[in-house]
């Protein structure tokens, strides 16, 4: 009965979303002022009601998982009676249908948030924004009801379920998808504000100020989600990497890059009234790329640890939806673009010009990632053979574009609006620049050897970090209140600096050993030694594992005992690797257990890593997230 109620709630939510999308938008064009206000006023209660209904549907599906209702096909496919309760709940979004329901729920949450926290915005603007969000919700709700019903019954009911994919039985699964989806879906709010501004013809500083905090919050969630996904892959997959240029990883990176450009472009539009058309295009692109990521994951065109098995009609539905969203928004833009004024004048050297250059570089980098991601799919679709585009392409094309992007962050932060002097910028940054050069020359020798990549990475990290600290110190010396947006900007920029140093350190100075080990064997990565002390079997709630005890020493001092595992799950017999990791401020020590190399299972392949600066990757991400939260909470944006 509960699954049927959940399905009915989705049907009602679709009707409510249709009302939310059609009537308020219609009301903005009626001649009667009374009728205008009446229809526009429906937007807020409809958005709240839609969120309640979708939440009821989600709760119904969660109940089916937690009660082991294997008469529901989706539950039988993605859960098991032995699955621990936290993972039973996380399994709600462990497959295609449930993850799509989570997507729709979060879209409804964003809509309700706009309805509740935009009281100072004009009613017609709120009606347009919520109307656009309502129409987007209609598209996804119809997608669920037509192709992806999570409440479909299985008769007769299965005695037990197939179990959740062992890869996903991890605490990271409980957090990573919701955070990532909050970022993905949050781009719909920036898109809705852009479309609403185009519909009203009001592309001005007020629109940018209204849109910016929502964009920053979405960017913050997306940053956190991508960081969590990278961290999960690092410790869960057992290969020690944090980014593999997987197509679905790329699908999350592309909207992040465009959203980063959008945030800074919105700032220029708010402060100077410039870049209006460019800002609108970035908002459209950010959401369109989020939809493209949805298509890549759910169409079945990709083979990936992230991708969901899917039938072709789902891919066709999303592709048509993507075409409608992009086509209609670009058509509206083309209609309104001639009426958009150019805004304030700017010189070649100014804060606006630096921010424009950076946003263009970010868009070009996005294009490079997009090309490498979809080109193999196009070649395959045209029956021109199979083509793989991997890390060599992305590292060769993407990294050179990021070097000037990161470099321009510092002068772009201190340059004056409208017009700046090169000599003034150079003088202001002379100390930071000189210190960054000295660190870039000297530190590589201290860390383990000089290379061009290490020198360049350390220079960029030091340049941004020292330049950011210099700006903070300069501002603290001046009187007056410092807004949260100032702190947010500089904390996020410092996070970029920390992240760049982390990437440089691990890429330049990582040491890896692939070894064969018996009990009591020792492998050394100076100044650490790793001794295999014992091997034993352990039993978990739904798996058995071989666990190794690896004692790590520095000299004669025992640092830690790592316990990597090789697990086999009862329901699928799928082998899984659980790495043993010791994290310090400056490095990770990482041990991964491979396969037995003899019948007696006394000799095992093992992979041992020394990973300098890896914790700085996650620290940099957390600083960016903290900066985003500070910026979004600035009192200028409270409505």
Predicted regions and their residues:
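Soluble non-transmembrane domains of integral membrane proteins
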Residues: 514-607
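Short, aromatic-rich amphipathic segments at membrane interfaces
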Residues: 90-91, 165-170, 588-616, 620
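Contiguous transmembrane helix-bundle modules in multi-pass membrane proteins
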Residues: 1-37, 56, 70, 175, ...
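Membrane-interface helix-loop-helix modules in multi-pass inner-membrane proteins
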Residues: 55-130, 145-164, 226-270, 293-316, ...
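Hydrophobic alpha-helical membrane-insertion segments
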Residues: 49-65, 133-146, 282-290, 358-370, ...
């Amino acid at each position: 009965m509960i699954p049927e109620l959940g399905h009915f709630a989705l049907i009602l939510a679709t009707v409510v979303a249709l009302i939310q999308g059609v009537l308020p938008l219609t009301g903005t064009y009626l001649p009667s002022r009374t009728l205008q206000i009446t229809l526009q006023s429906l937007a807020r209660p409809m958005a709240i009601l839609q969120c309640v209904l979708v939440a009821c549907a989600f709760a119904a599906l969660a109940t089916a998982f937690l009660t082991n209702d294997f008469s529901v096909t989706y539950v039988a496919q993605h859960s098991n009676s032995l699955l621990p309760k936290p993972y039973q709940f996380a399994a709600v979004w462990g497959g295609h249908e449930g993850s799509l329901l989570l997507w729709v729920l979060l879209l409804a949450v964003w809509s309700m948030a706009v309805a509740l926290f935009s009281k100072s915005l004009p009613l017609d603007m709120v009606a347009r924004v919520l109307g656009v969000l309502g129409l987007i919700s209609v598209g996804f709700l119809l997608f669920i009801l037509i192709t992806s019903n999570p409440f479909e019954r299985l008769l007769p009911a299965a005695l037990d379920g197939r179990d959740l994919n062992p890869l996903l039985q991890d605490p990271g699964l409980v957090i990573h998808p919701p955070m990532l989806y909050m970022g993905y879906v949050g781009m719909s709010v920036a898109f809705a504000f852009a479309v609403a501004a185009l519909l009203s013809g009001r592309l001005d500083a007020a629109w940018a100020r209204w849109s910016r905090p929502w964009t920053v919050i979405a960017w913050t969630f997306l940053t956190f989600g991508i960081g969590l996904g990278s961290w999960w892959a690092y410790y869960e997959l057992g290969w020690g990497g944090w980014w593999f240029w997987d197509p679905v990883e790329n699908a999350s990176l592309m909207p992040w890059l465009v959203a980063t450009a959008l945030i800074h472009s919105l700032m220029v539009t708010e402060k100077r009234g410039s870049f209006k058309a460019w800002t609108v295009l970035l908002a459209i692109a950010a959401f369109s790329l989020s939809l493209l990521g949805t298509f890549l994951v759910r169409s079945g065109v990709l083979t990936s640890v992230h991708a969901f098995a899917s039938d072709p009609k789902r891919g066709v539905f999303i592709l048509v939806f993507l075409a409608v969203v992009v086509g209609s928004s670009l058509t509206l833009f083309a209609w309104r673009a001639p009426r958009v004024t150019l805004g304030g004048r700017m010189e070649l050297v100014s804060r606006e010009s630096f921010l424009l250059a950076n946003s263009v570089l970010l868009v070009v980098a996005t294009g490079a990632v997009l090309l490498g991601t979809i080109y193999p799919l196009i070649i395959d679709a045209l029956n021109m053979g199979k083509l793989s585009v991997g890390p060599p392409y992305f590292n060769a094309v993407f990294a050179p574009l990021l070097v000037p992007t990161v470099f321009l962050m510092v002068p772009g932060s201190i340059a004056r609006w409208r017009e700046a002097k090169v000599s003034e910028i150079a003088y202001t940054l002379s100390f930071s620049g000189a210190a960054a050069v000295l660190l870039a020359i000297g530190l590589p020798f201290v860390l383990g050897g000089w290379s061009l990549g290490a020198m360049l990475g350390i220079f960029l990290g030091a340049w941004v970090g020292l330049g950011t600290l210099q700006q903070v110190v300069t501002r603290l010396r001046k009187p007056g209140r410092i807004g949260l947006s100032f702190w947010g900007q500089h904390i996020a920029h410092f996070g970029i600096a920390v992240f760049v140093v982390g990437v440089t350190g691990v890429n330049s100075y990582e040491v890896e050993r692939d070894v064969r080990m018996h009990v009591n064997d020792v492998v050394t990565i100076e100044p650490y030694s790793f001794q295999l002390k014992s091997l034993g079997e352990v039993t978990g709630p739904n798996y058995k594992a071989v666990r190794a005890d690896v004692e790590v020493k520095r000299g004669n001092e025992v640092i830690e005992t790592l316990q990597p595992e090789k697990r086999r799950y009862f329901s699928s017999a799928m082998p899984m690797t659980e790495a043993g990791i010791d994290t310090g401020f400056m490095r990770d020590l990482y041990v991964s257990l491979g396969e037995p190399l003899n019948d007696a299972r006394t000799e095992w392949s093992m992979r041992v890593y020394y990973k300098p600066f890896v914790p700085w990757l996650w620290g940099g991400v957390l600083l960016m997230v903290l900066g985003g939260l500070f910026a979004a909470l600035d009192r200028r944006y409270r409505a």
